[in-house]
């Protein structure tokens, strides 16, 4: 019994340490912020006038010159009413030497019609994927990002 508890405790500490290490690796290589924008008209993306949706805009700035691109395989909002259906991977390219900033967006949908969501600032997203480097092997990452502001305000 005690051995089983020690094993579970050890595994829990190992997975927690591994996740923190992946977040540090990501933060060392790239700086990323997330903005959001709701659709202007109901049904603009889906055709269903009762569905509210919008986009998350990922703004990335590389800190490591050897970073070629970021491949995002999974986006999970930490809000019960939001859903991201990622039908294909997201690639944030940094191919040119002078290009240190790049943006990419993904659509989200509000699942619950009774929920009124007006402001997503301070919300969080879990993302996971791979960092691809020029002369190193790819490094997987999982991190949590905070939603900073509306997309229009971030551009001004």
Task: List the model feature ranges, each with a label.
Residues 85-117:
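Intrinsically disordered, low-complexity Pro/Gly/Ser/Thr-rich segments with frequent PxxP/GP/PP motifs
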Residues 19-93:
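N-terminal topogenic membrane-targeting module
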Residues 1-31:
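A eukaryote-biased signal for short, well-structured alpha-helical docking elements
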Residues 112-154:
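Terminal connector regions
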